Amino acid sequence: MPAETPHNARRHWMAVLARAAADELAAGLAAHGGVPVYQCLRGPESGLVMVRGRAGGGGAPFNLGEMTVTRCTVRTADGQIGHAYVRGRDARQAELAAALDALLQDPVRGAALHAGVIVRLAAEQAAGRSETARKAAATKVQFFAMRNMRAA
Amino acid sequence: MTERPLDVTLPGFADPVGQAQACFRAVLDAMARPGTLVRAGEGLVPPAPLDPATGAVLLSLVDHDTPLWLDPGMQPARDWIAFHCGAGFANQPVCASFVLAQKLPDLTRLSPGTHEQPETAATLILQVDSLTDGARYRLRGPGLRTFGMLSARGLPDDFAAIWQRNRAGFPLGVDLVLCAGTTLAALPRSVTVERVT
C-alpha cells in the first residue's frame, strides 16, 4: 500500500470520480453543498488516447488500441483547479468530476466531501468489481484430470 | 516525481477547433500577403503580457511537437502556454521551432533550417507595441504585385539591415509573425524590407 500522501490521495479520488456516473456525481454534490461556482479553463472536450500495454507487464510496449476520453479542467471561485479525464463522451460527467476534484482539494469542504462521496462511491465500485470477479470465478475450469493423467 | 502545479487562471479558446482554424487561416493570409494586417484573437483573454493575437497564434500553431523558446519578458505566460498548448519548451533558441518574444532577438541565434529541409526553420512570434503607427517599411517580394507597406512600433532602429541579413540566406531563414492587440502581420523570409520613415 503506497504512503498516504496528498498526491496519492488525489490520485485515488480522481480514479473513483472517473468511474462514477454523472448522476452519482451530481447526487453527491447536491448532498454536500451543491455545485460550486466555477469556470471551465479547458473543455469538456472529447478525444482519442492510445492505450499501450506490455505483454506480461514487462515485454516490449505495444499499442493496444484507442479509446475515447473526455477531459475537463475547471477553476472554482476560490482558485482551486480541478482536472478530470473520464472514459467515453459524457461531458457532464467530466465537468462534474473536475468540479469535485477542485472541491476535494479545498481545505474546508474537502474532508466532508471525501467522507460523504468518495468513500461511498469507492465502496460501491469495489462491491461491483468483486461481484464481477465472483461470477467469473464460478466459470473457472480446473484441469485436475489432465494433470493427473500426465503424472500417471 | 512531484512537479510544480501549473498556475493557470484563464481559459483558452472557447471554441478550440473553430477559433484555431480561423487563426490559422489568418496567419496563412498574412504570410501570403506580407505586411497585410489581419485580425486574430478577438474574444480571447490571454494572461499578461500576451496580447489576444499573440495568444491566438500560440494556441493555433504551437503544440508538443514544436519546441517553444520564451523571451524572459514572456515568462509570466509560461504556465498558460504549457497548459493550453501542451508545449514543450526549448532551453536554447536554436533548438526552437517557435520563438516568442517582445524584443527582437538575435536572428542569427535562431534555427534557419537546413538546405534539405528549409521548412524546419524557426518562426518568430514577436509582439510589438503597434502595427498601425511607428516606423514605416516598404516590402517587396512574392505575394506583392508592386510593394506592400508595414508600420510597426517596437522594432529596433536597424531592423531593415537585420532583416536584410536574414533575407540573404534564402531559402534558409526565419519567418516573422508580428502581433499587436487583435491584429497581426507576417514577414516571410522571402520578403525584402526597406525603411521609409
Language-model-derived ranges and their functions:
Chain B
Residues 1-67, 71-73, 83-85, 182-183, ...:
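N-terminal, charge-rich interaction modules
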Residues 65-66, 75-197:
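Internal, well-folded beta-alpha domain core
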